[in-house]
C-alpha cells in the first residue's frame, strides 16, 4: 500500500538515495546528507511547534508500506523569504516612446523581485521513477492540499510553487548560460547546489538590481522563459488543474515558472470535506473514483488513495485502509476527489 506521512529520522537513507536521482535543477533536494538531515530536523521541529514562522517547513514522504521504503517526497514551506531573501524575476514591460520620432515600443524585461515574501510554498516534489504510475504523482502532490485544508491556520493567504526550468540532457540551462553566468561566472550546477543548500548570500551580492532587457538575450534563452523541464510538465499540469497559475514570475537560475493561487481558492483545499468512518470487511469498489483520504491528526498525519463511491456522510474503509490511516469506526477523516470533475482521468 502507498501511504503519505510526515518524515522521520529513519527516512534519511532513503531520501538521500532519492536525491541522487533528481538530476540538475532541483535545488530543494540536493544530494547532501548533512543538509537533508538538517531538513528532516527542521520538519520535526515544525510539527513540534518550536520554530518561528519564517523557519517552518513540513516534509512528507510517500511510503511503500510493503517494502517499508520511502519512494517520494513533497514539502510545504510556511512563509518564504522571512529569514533569507526570496528572489525571482518578474517578467515585466518597459515602454520607450518619443513623440518627436513617432516611436512607441514596449520592451519585455526581467526585474529582480522579492514579491512573494511571506507566501507559503509547495516544493521538493520528487517521486522515484520506478513509482511514476498508479496515480502516485498526483497523490504525492495533492496530499499537501488536504493537510493545508485541515490545518489552514498554519499557512499564508497565497500559495506558490516554483517549477523546475528547462535544461538539456547534459544539464545545460540556456537561461543560465545567457543570464546568470554573466554575473556569477560559475557553472549552473554549482549555483543550483549552493542555493539548494541554503548558501544564498551570493545572489544578493552579485545579481543585477536593474531590469534586464529580454530582447538582448539569445533566442535559446528567450524561448525557455516560463517553460518547465520535460520531466516537470506533469507536475505543472497537476497544480494547474487545482487552480495555480503562472503570473509572470520565473526562477533567477533556470527561468522556470512560478505558479501561484489564493490558498482558499485551490480546488482541493476549498472542496475537501469531512466524513465519519465506517469499517467494512469488503474491498473498496475498484470501479469507483479515486479519492485522497487523510486523518485529522496534526503530528500523526496519514493519507492514502482509495477508489470508492460516495453516497452519504460516511466513508467506508476496509480494515487495512483504516489501519494505514490510524483511524477507527466513528473517527472523522478529510476527503477530496483526486481529480477535479472536469479533468478526471
From Swiss-Prot:
Active site annotation, chain numbering: 229
Reactions it catalyzes: succinyl-CoA + L-arginine = N(2)-succinyl-L-arginine + CoA + H(+)
Pfam families: AstA
Molecular functions (GO terms): arginine N-succinyltransferase activity
InterPro entries in alphabetical order: Acyl_CoA_acyltransferase (IPR016181), Arg_succinylTrfase_AstA/AruG (IPR007041), Arginine_N-succinylTrfase (IPR017650)
Keyword field: Acyltransferase, Arginine metabolism, Transferase
Pathway the protein contributes to: Amino-acid degradation; L-arginine degradation via AST pathway; L-glutamate and succinate from L-arginine: step 1/5
EC number: 2.3.1.109
Binding site for succinyl-CoA: 125
Swiss-Prot/TrEMBL GO biological process terms: arginine catabolic process to glutamate; arginine catabolic process to succinate
Keyword Transferase in record: yes
Broad EC category: transferase
Keyword Transport: no
Role, per record: Catalyzes the transfer of succinyl-CoA to arginine to produce N(2)-succinylarginine.
Membership in a protein family: Belongs to the arginine N-succinyltransferase family.
Protein name: Arginine N-succinyltransferase
The gene coding this protein: astA
Amino acid at each position: 500500500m502507498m501511504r503519505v506521512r510526515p518524515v522521520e529520522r529513519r527516512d534519511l537513507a532513503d531520501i538521500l538515495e532519492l536525491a541522487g536521482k533528481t538530476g540538475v535543477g532541483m535545488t530543494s533536494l540536493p544530494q547532501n546528507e548533512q543538509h537533508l538531515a538538517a531538513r528532516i530536523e527542521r520538519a520535526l521541529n515544525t510539527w513540534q511547534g518550536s520554530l518561528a514562522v519564517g523557519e517552518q517547513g513540513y516534509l512528507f514522504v510517500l511510503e511503500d508500506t510493503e517494502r517499508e521504503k520511502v519512494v517520494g517526497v513533497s514539502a510545504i514551506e510556511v512563509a518564504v523569504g522571512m529569514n533569507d531573501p526570496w528572489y525571482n524575476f518578474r517578467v515585466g514591460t518597459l515602454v520607450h516612446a518619443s513623440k518627436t520620432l513617432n516611436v512607441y515600443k514596449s520592451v519585455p524585461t526581467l526585474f529582480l523581485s522579492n514579491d512573494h515574501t511571506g507566501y507559503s510554498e509547495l516544493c521538493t516534489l520528487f517521486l522515484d521513477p520506478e513509482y511514476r504510475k498508479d496515480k502516485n504523482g498526483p497523490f504525492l502532490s495533492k496530499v499537501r492540499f488536504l493537510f493545508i485544508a485541515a490545518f489552514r491556520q498554519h499557512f499564508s493567504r497565497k500559495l506558490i510553487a516554483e517549477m523546475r526550468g528547462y535544461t538539456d540532457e547534459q544539464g545545460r540551462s540556456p537561461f543560465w548560460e545567457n543570464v546568470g553566468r554573466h554575473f556569477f561566472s560559475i557553472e549552473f550546477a554549482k549555483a543550483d547546489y549552493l542555493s539548494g543548500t541554503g548558501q544564498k548570500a551570493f545572489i544578493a551580492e552579485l545579481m543585477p538590481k536593474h531590469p534586464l532587457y529580454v530582447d538582448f538575450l539569445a533566442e535559446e534563452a528567450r524561448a525557455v522563459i516560463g517553460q518547465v523541464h520535460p520531466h516537470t510538465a506533469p507536475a505543472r499540469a497537476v497544480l494547474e488543474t487545482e487552480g495555480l497559475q503562472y503570473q509572470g514570475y520565473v526562477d533567477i537560475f533556470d527561468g522556470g515558472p512560478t505558479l501561484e493561487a489564493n490558498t482558499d481558492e485551490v480546488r482541493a483545499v476549498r472542496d475537501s470535506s469531512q466524513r465519519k468512518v465506517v469499517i467494512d470487511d469488503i474491498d473498496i469498489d475498484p470501479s469507483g473514483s479515486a479519492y485522497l483520504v487523510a486523518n485529522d491528526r496534526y503530528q500523526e498525519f496519514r493519507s492514502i488513495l482509495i477508489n470508492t463511491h460516495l453516497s452519504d456522510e460516511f466513508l467506508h474503509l476496509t480494515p487495512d485502509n483504516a489501519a494505514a490511516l490510524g483511524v477507527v469506526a466513528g473517527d472523522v477523516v478529510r476527503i477530496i476527489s483526486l481529480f477535479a470533475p472536469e479533468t478526471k482521468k
